[in-house]
Amino acid sequence: MTVEEFLERPERWDGNHEELIEGEIYLSPNNKPRHNIVVDRIQERLQPLKKQGFVVLGEVACRVSDSSLPNTDVAVIRQDRWEANGLDNFLPESPALVVEVASPNQMRKLLNKAALYLEYGAEQVWIAYPQKRVVQVLSADGSREAREAETVEFHGIVIPVSEIFPA
């Protein structure tokens, strides 16, 4: 299925939380409070990126290919790219940084999404695992896990992993 076919479906707008990944539709459950807290904490700590010409967004759909329109939990995109696209559309490309907060049983889907984001231009993808209190940092150079006593970094903004997850 293409992005156009996905968007033209009448049932697309019935309130389901769905996304298109490599031509397949994935439904996601409603986010739990812990998920939302982690998203909020990450967004808050990324706000200094605004001074570097970035926009920090919450959930947003990103068209990364003709057959993929995944949703991010947090997206960081350059201000000029955001303004060129307009404020009422999905992003036409992969953000510079994508953050996904993992829910149980989502590992395969999140790794597929991360590979897509990186293939289509993301500098980094962070996958936060609240149950393990770990952030997996993926980039074109490889992958590493940042544990609670460690930090994650994007364009000079350093975030202690311990500040991301609620007690």
Q: Whereabouts are the PLM-identified features?
A:
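Gly/Pro/Ser/Thr-rich low-complexity, intrinsically disordered segments predominantly at protein N-termini
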Residues: 1-167
